[in-house]
Amino acid sequence: MLSDINKISSEENICINAICFTGDLINAGSNNETDFDLFFENFVFPLLENTGLDLKNIFFVPGNHEIDTSKIDEYAEAGICSKLIDSESIEAFFNKPSPAVLDRINYFQRIYDSFCEAPLIYKDEFCRCYRVDINNVVFGFACLNSAWRSSGKGAIERGKMIIGAVQVKNALDAISDVDVKVCLVHHPLDWLVESDQFDVEKAIYNFDLIFNGHIHTLDSKQIIAYQGQSVISTCGKFFPTKDFYNGYSIVSIDPETLEGKIYLRQYYSGSRECFDKNLQLYDDGCFEFVLGNRDPLLIKAFEILHDIQPGFVEYATGFFISNIAGHKHVKSFEDAFVIPVLGRFSEYEKSLIMNLKI
């Protein structure tokens, strides 16, 4: 990877000024002291030396692998699952968090104190924010914690994570006067509980750049898209195996025009064993964007539509025939939708099927 970074930096005339990690830095939080020492000694420090940077230039967030599962209180866990069910209860928790619930990830504050030396401008139990001047452009880095609700159970946690709109808004307030707002968070938004996803989406798209991770499957790979005029970059697993998508990204921003590019780098195993362009998503393995073009009217329109969406869905659900005339209550459109049976057929097989139907 180091040689690949040097190659891209030379070819594209890029200077690396910051390094961001979006979680799953170690294998298990229960071994955090040993594993973090190994992570920094064998990966981070060589990377910093290669790029000429130091601990003032790295930013990171915890992922589900950082959770110390030995610290999870099963009774506190059962209680929090039954309580955090809507926007009001989630907001109340963030205003007065329970130490028993956060015990599984509390050690990560020590990791921040030991290994992140960037200028800190805000911190609480969940979030840390930093302010950095890069080539006369002021960047605000908000490191959000989406992993605090994880219990290390993997895919079954989808739809159960919580970021909390309060956490996002506190971070935005802390970096409100910077030129470029950058958000680091581990879980994609579709891993959040439904009520939290609605609230967080409305707030988080005030960031210019949103970096997240957690996606380890070939289906998702690396996703970059405009959402509310924010650029979202989701990176796959960084581990040299054939069964997962592996890669990283280099984000380049022109300090004068705020025009940017994201260079998508994918690891190719087998005979090559190297990083190269990811051509599966974008031509030439590069995504181009422009920051700073936020239309206040479009933002307001997005907020209005976003606010009425839950109420409209609830209202429309009441008109299901099964809700009106039947005895079974259908809670949502998702509950009523039946996935059609799909299959792969050649043109010859399809013609036989059509003939049988005729």
Descriptions of predicted regions:
Residues 253-356:
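A short C-terminal boundary segment appended to hydrolase-like catalytic domains
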Residues 146-215, 220:
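Active-site-proximal segments of metal-dependent phosphoesterases and phosphodiesterases across multiple
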Residues 48-123:
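Active-site neighborhood of divalent metal-dependent phosphoester bond hydrolases
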Residues 19, 24, 39, 63, ...:
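Divalent metal-coordination and catalytic microenvironments
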Residues 136, 190-262:
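Conserved beta-sheet core of the metallophosphoesterase superfamily
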Residues 91-178:
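Binuclear metal-dependent hydrolase catalytic cores centered on His/Asp/Glu-rich metal-binding motifs
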